[in-house]
């Protein structure tokens, strides 16, 4: 089943709601989602339809790695973590940068040698390649630091069979040796990575105890995951796979769209309509994705005629902030999504945007306007109106208020009172319980008013504190926290908004992968003598990167805004290259006017 973007989730839910769920029962079905966030969303929707709790469905709606974790009966201590990777790299003598250090830097973590070695090891496992094939990974390797394969390394020695491959003074890193050392280190310490889990499940033929298998986002599975799927498939009564080959965003992890395109199925259903995209936006994204060499052609009908596509050349972050603010104020019911290629770019925008006081959600796992923070803010607003707060909001106050708010008392005293009230109320969800403002002020006599709410916060990040301060000082109090969402393009998968802003800036890591792929394919890039990670502007895209931007652009229900050269210092992907795969030097307005027309029939 090869559905296209948009509301495929509802179509899949309808398919799931037929014989499997309403016949044998939901416990006989395993729904495999690619990410934890996607699994959580499916659980919520299914729970609502089945009148079941989402938590109860965790064993039946999860990622393949989560199911492998259960089948292998692992604990968290068995799984490789950031500190384990750091420790190995220190022992082996190579640099490593953890995800927290690298999240806000312009250069990517994967350009650090230890990160590249471990990522290469994982990529080889996911694509079922031997260690000797390490040079196939889409990375660029510096011959000054790394021994390349002897047939391409200028320092390799040739002669008779007794001639050593490398000179005795060659102290460059041997990548296969480092990969084998990493795998041996994991074994010595009794640790497994995500790829190791899937290998063990496949090798031991461990099967989920279900009769029906549903695999979502099938286009993003790796060869290793496909092997697990092949191990499970013969034991199922019925299998449903759903995916869109144009939406492969995890190719850098080994995802292979050909696994979807070449899969032999009994029934192949191509959904005919786009439930999200109006005609102009649909035509533009079709223009962008049409340059992919191998793909399944789709002839989609738009949700409606019209829609708006805008291109903004060389805006500043402040320009983008003003654009988003104007959007929020002009379309009072509309939703907005601002997407970047990397988290560090998103943080640059957040730094400028926080001062507006507009509440927002982060699609990534960053601690910003979380549910926890929103509940604290709602509690402060409610107390300011001298109205009762919910039991959940009261607990947030007890937990997040600074010690000074409790005067000579203790926060535990408020917790004790709330515990007693919950027992008396006998409610399953404390959000349904009310607590009068007098009780809160009795135990927290210095509970702040909105103006001081940020100053009296604890257990929050600097960004969160600044957000609360700006919110109560601004004009957007009471605004729905979900109206504005920020994230990376990857984190936006499966979501949508009325207004979508997509920054076309890339990262050195991405450009490095593009350059490596172009070199492997032997492609000529007009106007570029040497294509490296420092090439700017970027003159071409790979199919994999084109699919990523297709996902970002196809989130828009009403308006798509493309932002060219937004992020200072980031490699610039011009919009003409995005739409035509090469520089055209055409005027942006002319480019968009042409792209908004339907593609000629193939």
Residue spans for each PLM region:
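C-terminal accessory regions
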Residues: 451-487, 493-499, 504-599
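Conserved helicase motor core of SF1/SF2 NTP-dependent helicases
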Residues: 8, 34-37, 212, 219-306, ...
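P-loop NTPase Walker
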Residues: 1-79, 283-286, 554
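Helicase P-loop NTPase motor core of nucleic-acid translocases
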Residues: 1-30, 41-45, 171, 196-199, ...
């Amino acid at each position: 089943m090869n559905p296209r973007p948009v509301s495929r989730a509802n179509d899949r839910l309808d398919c799931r709601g037929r014989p499997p769920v309403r016949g044998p029962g939901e416990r006989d079905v395993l729904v495999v989602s690619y990410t934890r966030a996607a699994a959580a969303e499916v659980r919520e929707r299914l729970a609502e339809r089945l009148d079941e709790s989402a938590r109860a469905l965790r064993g039946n709606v999860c990622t393949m790695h989560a199911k492998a974790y259960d089948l292998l009966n692992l604990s968290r201590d068995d799984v490789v973590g950031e500190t384990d990777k750091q420790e190995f790299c220190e022992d082996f003598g190579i640099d490593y940068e953890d995800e927290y250090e690298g999240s806000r830097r312009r250069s990517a973590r994967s350009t650090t040698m230890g990160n590249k070695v471990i990522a290469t090891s994982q990529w080889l496992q996911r694509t079922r390649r031997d260690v000797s094939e390490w040079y196939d990974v889409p990375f660029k390797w510096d011959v000054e630091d790394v021994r390349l394969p002897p047939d391409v390394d200028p320092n390799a020695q040739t002669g008779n069979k007794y001639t050593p491959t490398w000179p005795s003074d060659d102290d460059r890193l041997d990548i296969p040796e480092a990969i084998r050392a990493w795998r041996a280190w994991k074994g010595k310490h009794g640790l497994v990575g995500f790829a190791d889990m899937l290998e063990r499940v496949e090798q031991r033929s461990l099967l989920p105890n279900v009769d029906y298998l549903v695999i979502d986002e099938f286009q993003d599975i790796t060869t290793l995951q496909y092997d697990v799927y092949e191990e499970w498939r013969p034991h199922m009564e019925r299998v449903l796979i759903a995916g869109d080959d144009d939406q492969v965003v995890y190719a850098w992890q080994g995802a292979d769209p050909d696994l979807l395109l070449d899969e032999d199925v009994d029934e192949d259903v191509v959904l005919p309509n786009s439930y999200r995209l109006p005609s102009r936006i649909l035509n533009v994204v079709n223009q962008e994705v049409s340059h992919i060499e191998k793909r399944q052609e789709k002839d989609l009908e738009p949700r409606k005629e019209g829609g708006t596509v805008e291109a903004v050349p060389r805006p500043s972050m402040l320009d983008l902030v003003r654009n988003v603010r104007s959007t929020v104020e002009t379309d009072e019911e509309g939703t907005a999504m601002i997407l970047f290629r990397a988290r560090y770019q998103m943080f640059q925008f957040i730094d400028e945007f926080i001062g507006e006081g507009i509440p927002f959600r982060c699609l990534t796992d960053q601690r910003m306007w979380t549910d926890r923070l929103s509940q604290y803010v709602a509690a402060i607003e409610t107390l300011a109106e001298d109205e009762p707060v919910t039991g959940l909001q009261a607990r947030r106050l007890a937990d997040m208020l600074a010690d000074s708010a409790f005067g000579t008392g203790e926060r535990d005293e408020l917790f004790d009172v709330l515990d007693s009230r919950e027992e008396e109320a006998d409610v399953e969800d404390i959000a349904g319980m009310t607590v009068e403002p007098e009780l809160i002020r009795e135990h927290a006599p210095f509970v702040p008013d909105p103006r001081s709410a940020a100053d009296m916060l604890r257990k929050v990040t600097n960004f969160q504190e600044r957000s609360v301060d700006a919110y109560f000082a601004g004009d957007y109090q009471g605004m729905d926290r979900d109206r504005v969402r920020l994230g990376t393009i990857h984190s936006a998968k499966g979501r949508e908004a009325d207004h979508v802003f997509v920054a076309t800036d890339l990262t050195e890591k991405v450009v490095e992968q593009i350059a490596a792929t172009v070199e492997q394919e032997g492609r000529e890039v007009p106007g570029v003598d040497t294509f490296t990670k420092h090439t700017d502007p970027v003159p071409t895209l790979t199919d994999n990167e084109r699919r990523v931007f297709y996902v970002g652009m196809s989130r828009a229900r009403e308006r798509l805004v493309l932002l060219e050269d937004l992020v200072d210092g980031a490699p610039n992907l011009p919009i003409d290259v995005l739409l035509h795969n090469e520089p055209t030097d055409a005027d942006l307005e002319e480019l968009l006017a042409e792209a908004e027309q339907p593609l000629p029939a193939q």
